[in-house]
Amino acid sequence: MAGDVEIAHLDLADLAGVRKFADSVDRVDVLINNAGVLGLPLTRTADGFEAHMGTNYLGHFALTCLLGDKIKDRAISVVSASYALSRLHIDDLNWHNRKYSKWAAYGESKLAIMLFSCELARRGVRTYMTDPGATDTDITRDTTGLLPWVREHTFRRFPAHSAATGAQSTIQAVTTDLPSGSYLAPRFNQWGKPKVTRLRKKARDPAMARRLWELSVELTGCDWQNSDAG
């Protein structure tokens, strides 16, 4: 398959850069929200957001909304099974008033983007969520503490997917027409071929999703854009 590749700079941890990037784009057939950080100590983005929430969710929220109906086919978000162990603290999304946990911060950011994806589907946007499972990537490259050691020794015993294998759920979401809001995850939680998987109620909660959307608009200054709007 032949094609052209064009590379552009985009830092989802900086909303000014997100706006500049979105303004430069005329059309998107398929948007894949795949940026991610994991296991960072308490860090703030350029806009003051906690780094996991700011990068993994709020940056993607802003980008998706600013592109708006320039997205012609579908929007896909790469998520994580860690959402199942998470609880979204909607009144303290950016960890100003509670003891920080980098693992909880990551899980909450993934739960947030799943709620956002479900709300997009309710608003008529074709959207899917994909989970790569246990995949050997550099997402933990900036992690401190025990995780690098645990990761190395765990993957010796239980081999992780290659990045190419981990991408299969996303490729399936790009190339297959499924009901909007579908969640594709490995058959055996972290391993196995991707299949459509039922979301837990916490990721499908319409009231929480609406609250999160409204708060995200307030925090980012971005809302869904219609290109025909004056």
List each language-model region with its residue ranges.
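Rossmann-fold NAD(P)H-dependent dehydrogenase/reductase core
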Residues: 1-143, 218-230
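Short, flexible, mixed-charge acidic loops at enzyme active sites
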Residues: 88-94, 142-147, 184-193
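C-terminal segments of enzyme domains that contribute to small-molecule binding surfaces
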Residues: 200-225
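Short acidic, glycine/proline-rich loop/turn micro-motifs
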Residues: 44, 194-200
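Pocket-edge positions in alpha/beta enzyme catalytic cores
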Residues: 10, 158, 201-204
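A short C-terminal helix-loop "cap" of Rossmann-like NAD(P)-dependent dehydrogenase/epimerase domains
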Residues: 96, 146-155
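C-terminal helical subdomain
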Residues: 109, 153-196, 206-210, 214
